[in-house]
Amino acid sequence: MIRAVFFDSNANDLMEMINPARTYVAFDRKEVPQILDIVENSSKEGLYVAGFVSYEAASSFDLALKHQQLQDTPLAWFTEFRAIRPFELTENDDAIELSPVAEAEDFISSVLRIKDFLERGDVYQVNLTQKLVGDLKNSTTDIFSRLVRTQPSPYAMLLESDGFSICSASPELFFSKKGKIIEMQPMKGTRERGRFNEEDQKNKEDLKASEKDRAENLMILDMVRNDLGKVCLPGSLSTPALFELHSFPTVWQQTSSVVGETVCSLAEIFSSVFPCASVTGAPKVRAMEIIAELEQHPRGVYTGAMGYLKPGGETLFNVSIRTMYIDKVKKNATYGIGSGIVWDSDPEAELAESLAKAKILSFPSLPFELFETMKYTPREGIYLIE
């Protein structure tokens, strides 16, 4: 089975791409830009296209970007489809049980190593990640449904082939392009949702007032502006939104936006902005060298990009966080989590922040119709009604 599911903003609903045509797979870095050129032309010819680019495809666009080597996962995978239809989520709400590959002490030790690099002036920030793994009994549709019900996102995607499935409820836009207009929306800054309204508002205000999170967000925003500026028309870049807070059932997130105009190809855009600065650190080249040294495993699709092209060329890619890779042959799953490390980072707090991003796997996505009574107050309204 080959299929793709995406959120269609025009229909304001999830849609499934059907009637697959050709599939393009890259295991060699030189093939990645070629495939991007091919699928961009396919969309202009009236086909739908969906696929992913792995984090380790970075050197396809810039040999200075270092990373570990992927083994079984493609560097890029895209399929053409002839049509779309509405997609229905399942009601299955079973928790997904995965465990960290590394011990907590290993993550904390890596944070301390990064702080050494920061003290020496090698970098300003490094995005450190780890993996959760486990055997899988849930179906791909059930997993995707759980993730999307728990964390609804306009950037959610499901990709499935005979050998793998990828379920993403990413809240982060990598870039979208419609006509000449291109937008990126880097995300930096996370807080857990509170158990009750007062705690939730406290966590929200803490994120809103955090100088550390704002500094991180601004640092990454500057990198994104620089990356995007290379492929945008002179004078067209703007920053319409700074430090916006977005609520999800398990976390608060902080984003900023950059918008510009471009006439560059899809491959040229990727060569300038991939991987997204929010999942590497600053400066990107040195941060990725440190990531390759400290992280125990390749990232694969996690922190890469998943996306689609519609007939006519409208394009959207997410930053593939909150994303599960399922090996259908080995019947196991991998889910990445991470945190941005800066000079004043507290190792224990960074570990807690990264683990908070895994709550989507077990947080109950209760349908509202099960509630017979709900507390309402004029000041607070109904807590978590959104």
Language model segments and positions:
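Extended alpha-helical targeting/anchoring segments
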Residues: 1-386
